[in-house]
From Swiss-Prot:
Gene3D superfamilies: Ribosomal protein S8 (1.20.5.1150)
Gene name of the encoded protein: rpsU
Disulfide feature: none
Keyword annotations: Ribonucleoprotein, Ribosomal protein
GO biological process: translation
Molecular function terms from GO: structural constituent of ribosome
Record-given protein name: Small ribosomal subunit protein bS21
InterPro entries, alphabetized: Ribosomal_bS21 (IPR001911), Ribosomal_bS21_CS (IPR018278), Ribosomal_bS21_sf (IPR038380)
Length: 56
């Protein structure tokens, strides 16, 4: 879990910007979106192979 402590003389907007950057850097939001709904293992494998094919 990401924590952001508001510094002295720092606006809430700046602290929120730092927090959002930290969350996106750790990939927390993407992980939540990925796990929002159950995905069968066969579907997961299919998506993984399609992504690999798309990268090449």
């Amino acid at each position: 879990m990401s924590k952001t402590i508001v510094r002295k003389n720092e606006s809430i907007d700046d602290a929120l910007r730092r927090f959002k950057r930290a969350v996106s850097k750790t990939g927390t939001l993407q992980e939540v979106r990925k796990r929002e709904f159950y995905e069968k293992p066969s579907v997961r494998r299919k998506k993984k192979s399609e992504a690999a094919r798309k990268r090449k």
